[in-house]
Amino acid sequence: MYKEPFQPTYEYALECDKHDELKDFQTEFYKKEGTIYLDGNSLGLLSKRAEKSLFTLLDSWKEYGIDGWTEGEHPWFFLSEKLGELTAPLIGALPEETIVTGSTTTNIHQVIATFYEPKGIRTKILADELTFPSDIYALQSQIRLKGLDPDEHLVRVKSRDGRTLSEDDIIHAMTDDVALILLPSVLYRSGQILDMKRLTAEAHKRGIHIGFDLCHSIGSIPHHFKEWDVDFAIWCNYKYLNAGPGGVAGLYVNKKHFNRLPGLSGWFSSRKDKQFDMEHTLTAADHAGAYQIGTPHVLSTAPLIGSLEIFKEAGIERLREKSLHITRFMLNLIAHELSDFGFTIGNPLEDEKRGGHIYLEHAEAARICKALKANGVIPDFRAPNGVRLAPVALYNTYEEVWHSVQILKKIMKDEEYKQFENKREVVA
């Protein structure tokens, strides 16, 4: 599919673009002329199909009013379940195990409220010190709600190098007092992929339920939850899945746990045929829909309809193949062109351990990001010293990667970054 061996040349980039099996999808997305967008790991670009599906649901509201819940091309009452079915192949799950609902953080609260049952000596939640802050805030809140002290009952596995986690260290921390584990599938800074299969097996050997935050992996790498027997997972849909800012999130619960009442119940936890009976005793759905809480955010869900159609056509295996190749091309270019400018590559270099973005460390990272934006390259900054660059398989080209590295080289060589203050913006 892609030309080998790697060559750090413009001609090689053009040749790779020529043979890219996914190149036709680039025209599906709105790409600003004169800009190279490398921030799809933070917010994916708008596709024409996502835009169309949003307008379709607006038209349903216009035409049907309240009857839009059961009428139109995409009836709202069943939309969360329908999109769950379309998402399931991306995580290797059954359709009934997947639901589109809530936000990442509310879904963390839901799964922790459902699965965290401190009893006897098993009172602790195991997480890690590199995970996204919102995960920690939610875990601390849930521990407090049980009347326990997060400082004592939340265990965070330490990183040996400040960038990555050792699976051996995580397994070593699976002690007899751990009741539940929540880990990232891909670390948001370094892009390290954790071995979810191994960690799940080791947790289950010890009688511990384990779940994963998929925010930086879903839509970028394949998952095989049915095979791995993961207990639960949560994710956002606005990064690689291109559902738009504030797009409704996702939640997975292994079918073996469907007998568990949701820790946080609401009207939409109900079985569909019972919901409008208005009973004060919940008859929970017998699938992942039980873990919904309130009324679906229909208009924030709508873009995902069109986006998931694209993923179905492209295929997650092909997307991963290109992602690995184009990020490897970028890494090789960085090594070839930027070795004299003080950058450190913060990613694992092994393909099987690297997610969809490149993570560069530099003391001047904040203002380097500002200089990149001033030159038409959109990265993002992550404190304290990280530049994230995500060439997304669906819409970025090898030519764009080549140009972005040349622009970065010029910024460093001419010290253009010194025009800017070395601190982050309000939104980094």
UniProtKB/Swiss-Prot annotation:
Pfam families membership: KYNU_C
Keyword ATP-binding listed: no
GO biological process, one term: anthranilate metabolic process
One GO location term (cellular component): cytoplasm
Record-listed pyridoxal 5'-phosphate binding positions: 104-105, 132-135, 213, 216, 238, 267, 295
EC number: 3.7.1.3
N6-(pyridoxal phosphate)lysine sites (modified residues): 239
Keyword GTP-binding: no
Pathway(s) served: Amino-acid degradation; L-kynurenine degradation; L-alanine and anthranilate from L-kynurenine: step 1/1; Cofactor biosynthesis; NAD(+) biosynthesis; quinolinate from L-kynurenine: step 2/3
Cofactor: pyridoxal 5'-phosphate
MF terms in GO: kynureninase activity; pyridoxal phosphate binding
SUPFAM superfamilies: PLP-dependent transferases
Family: Belongs to the kynureninase family.
Main function: Catalyzes the cleavage of L-kynurenine (L-Kyn) and L-3-hydroxykynurenine (L-3OHKyn) into anthranilic acid (AA) and 3-hydroxyanthranilic acid (3-OHAA), respectively.
Binding partners and assembly: Homodimer.
PANTHER family: KYNURENINASE
The protein's name: Kynureninase
